[in-house]
């Protein structure tokens, strides 16, 4: 053994070849600080051993290295710039040391080789993989960019255009694509990976392969003429500006970094990369996007705990009520390997449900995600039925009938009598209290809410609603089933609107008040989309939700929270509802809708709507963008904080993920609690108090006032644990 540490070891093989194997005690290898320090010492030991003629990098895991340890990021990013620079220089010295070893080096890859793992193997002379190999640099998805030499070595290895595509998109290349662009030198069978690696390395040692020429290419300036460089970088900037936009600076910064470093040798180019990395690491966007990643891991961890604690796994499911929503739920269950009975009283609804499932599977087939055989198998695992025969086989039943409490209660009561005492019943409802529906059941402990979002196949969030009688085992089993479906389940306690709809309607109320005071709805939409970053402004979102649906839900919320959410009079939603302008579903709401050539709705503004809205709108008035943002967002933010204060949702992490996954809250802002931390809670309290005269929705929750006085934040613990 040449060197041994907790996460890696170096041993001598035959013919002067040494093998450096990453072998962390955890389930995956990560390039955390400890592993980097061990790698540094291992490389020193290798350089000092005159018997070593070649080095093979390998992994004892199914994945080579999944990347840096992201849990360390927020702590590192919070350090002074000089300390952050030292960390990057330390990592750069290690990879330079690997690249400068006086003998050829080769990485044998399998599974994921991502982020810092990819940057590590870019420092070796050769890379071969098997069919499972996936290699790439996903850092821009976290609001940062490669910082261990990725923007320097990748363009010099595969060319600037291919490198910029991979880096700006945060892309991982599968084996075939990696081979095509030059990231991999060969793909071999998994059982021959190490033998092939040794053969290739031996050829390099014997100088049958020119490893020194390859190394020189990676450590020299890019070979681009001035004209080629101008065309390449101008085109890349144009494409990135179009796709990433101003709220996500990391992709554009990556292009600028590669451009600035193009004519420089390795070490000077690394200085450029380091400078830009630090700038991004200190950005609020990076804090938010890294925070989302960590929060997502937290949600997944909770789901795993639930699966472990659950009394049984879900092997079979049933959906009551077909149509688009029922078909979407059935599709998602079957796609992830849980056969499902789809029951409805109407043949045309069953047909619609099966058509929806088939349509979604066809899209998977077209994209090459599944083959025809698998598609047939998935469709066969959805059993459409007009009867309850076979319902007793279901471990979990999802009721998804019409949003009517009497109908839902009757269906749930009926099906409860047909299944055994262990079967879990759930209701897919967006507005009906779970405690109300539970009254119709003999076993309310086996019942909870399971609120899917439309379209089911795209929206990651499922709200799991705990009623006052719901058992912990019921929650665990349903959370585990939702996770098995590939969803992000978040548990909330029962209240009107649960969590997502409860916090959405104060946002709509803020929007309605602005219109009452003379704001133009198109201007509000423009500001909330382009400046705040929502995928849709409030008027457009109401059209998509459905004005009729929103009108009904608004009444439910007003009844549930009369102090804050009762209407003071007719509003824009009422005016459109009375005019039967229901939004996208019937072609007219705030906007007019037509269908484009691809069958997708296309919106346009029409003056006709102004006459309908005139009685509920004040005299036209201009508001500056910041006022529009503050007046729409403060009611939502206050309601989110109240939900945490009241225990409707358990943590800031879960609330922020529900907002991002359920409502499309701008990811670069990280959710309401991350947003509050970013702008400063004391600053928010002062800002919100300016609008106190607008009513109860604008009153700052006591929790925020206390935190402002104490100078605390919601994510201080997450940052401290990373230090």
Swiss-Prot record:
Its EC number is 4.2.1.17, 5.1.2.3, 5.3.3.8, 1.1.1.35. GO terms for biological process: fatty acid beta-oxidation. Residues 1-189 are annotated as: Enoyl-CoA hydratase/isomerase. PROSITE patterns: 3HCDH. InterPro entries: 3-OHacyl-CoA_DH_CS, 3-OHacyl-CoA_DH_NAD-bd, 3HC_DH_C, 6-PGluconate_DH-like_C_sf, ClpP/crotonase-like_dom_sf, Enoyl-CoA_hydra/iso, FA_oxidation_alpha_subunit, FadB. The record marks 119, 139 as: Important for catalytic activity. Substrate binds at residues 296, 501, 661. It catalyses: a (3S)-3-hydroxyacyl-CoA + NAD(+) = a 3-oxoacyl-CoA + NADH + H(+); a (3S)-3-hydroxyacyl-CoA = a (2E)-enoyl-CoA + H2O; a 4-saturated-(3S)-3-hydroxyacyl-CoA = a (3E)-enoyl-CoA + H2O; (3S)-3-hydroxybutanoyl-CoA = (3R)-3-hydroxybutanoyl-CoA. Gene3D superfamilies: 1.10.1040.50, 2-enoyl-CoA Hydratase, Chain A, domain 1, NAD(P)-binding Rossmann-like Domain. One of its GO terms (cellular component) is fatty acid beta-oxidation multienzyme complex. GO terms for molecular function: 3-hydroxybutyryl-CoA epimerase activity; delta(3)-delta(2)-enoyl-CoA isomerase activity; enoyl-CoA hydratase activity; long-chain-3-hydroxyacyl-CoA dehydrogenase activity; NAD+ binding. HAMAP family: FadB. This is Fatty acid oxidation complex subunit alpha. The gene is fadB.
